Amino acid sequence: MIPKIIHYCWFGRGEKSKTIKKCLRSWEKKCKDFKTIEWNEDNFNIESHPFVKAAYEDKNWAFVSDYVRLYALNLYGGIYMDTDVQLVKPIDGFLENEAFLGFENKNNVANGLIFGIEKGHWFTQKLLADYDSILYVANDVNFRMKNTNTERATKILVDMGLKLNNQFQIINGIAVYPSEYFCPLDVNTFLMHKTKNTVSIHWYEGAWTSARYKEWKRQQIRRNRIDKVRCLPQRMLRKFLGDSTVDRLKSKIK
């Protein structure tokens, strides 16, 4: 059984944003009897692994976190979440799994959305061992894209039989949930697909991302809001008149 410990990483000693503080408060509210551990420069030895040391010197906090989350989960077990993950429901029901995580989309799983696992599990040990043969490369976009935890975790599970179909599966004891559970916000469109099964929302705050990406994200969200307002009259008509009536009226207008 997965222990009631929540791990998160905060390296670089920067100020936490309002979104991140809101997400952390949601953990306290939904997981009142969980222990929470913040991993940072004070309780993790940056010099303990060459990959972490190089990533830290490059101020690539995301890659530092990629390693440290696995270290923490392997040592203690528990739950890891990125700091921009908001809980909307309790997670106690998932603790009966020996390990669980979720699809980010139909193409990959992600262990930053929420990743629960028993201590000393083969999956964290395998992911950790990979870092012994990875040389960190600074300022290389191709390296960053190919060496995230998401990419490597997905590859391991696919090699063991995971089907990239965004459907619930259990692979060698690891429960993989559809994106509606832990990732209802589409990272490409920033459209929300929340359902009755949604447990958490990853807001893609991306503290390590570029200003260009953040501006693109703001513009995308703005366009989505404009489209939502523009389509409001038609949605209201469909709600009160029904789809068939609205479609019939539209065909007559044409």
Predicted features, each with a name:
Residues 67-78:
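Small-residue hinge/turn detector
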Residues 1-65, 83-254:
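Glycosyltransferase-associated regions of secretory-pathway enzymes
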